Amino acid sequence: SSAASDVYKRQDIQVLMKDSVDANGLQRMQVSDSKTSFTYKGKEYQSSVVRRPDDSLPVVINEQGDKFVDNSITLRITSGGKSIVDKVFTKESFASLVDAKFMKHSILEGLVYDKTTPQGIVYAASVCYPQSDLYIPLSITVSADGKISLAKEELLEDLHETDSI
């Protein structure tokens, strides 16, 4: 498939971020910290996702020449006081899944808890062109023992499709 087919347009534009702009004209997304609890295979889990603009990452410049600070996102999952995952993701974490040209001008925008499946705990991540509706949806699956696998999310245009057995 062509790389362009992996890029989706958002339906709801509210997602567009409120950026702050500093003296150097660099735009930053706000720091966000979201906590979730869920049960997986009979155990209680707590998860925290902290997104922060990370000045150690290369600055992203869009076609208009606006400059953006890319984000790093820390995912922590604990169960019964034990750490299952404590990992920092950057857009480079997904380099093997995202077209290099898209990668260059995009930022790691977000990571949210999605669902649990027999394979593990699933988080949805997105790499996007800053302040646009173009993004690549990605998924992070964490197994019960903390192994992490990354995949590109294939968004089904037709939700009525059933998987053939």
PLM region spans:
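Acidic, glycine-rich flexible loop segments
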Residues: S96-P137
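A short local loop/turn or secondary-structure capping micro-motif enriched for an aromatic residue
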Residues: D55-S56, S93-S96, Q131-S132, E157-E161
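Short, low-complexity, Pro/Ser/Thr/Gly-rich segments in the mature regions of secreted, periplasmic
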Residues: S143-I165
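Beta-propeller blade signature
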Residues: I73-I77, S139-A144
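Surface-exposed acidic loop/strand-edge motifs in secreted or periplasmic proteins
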Residues: L16-G110
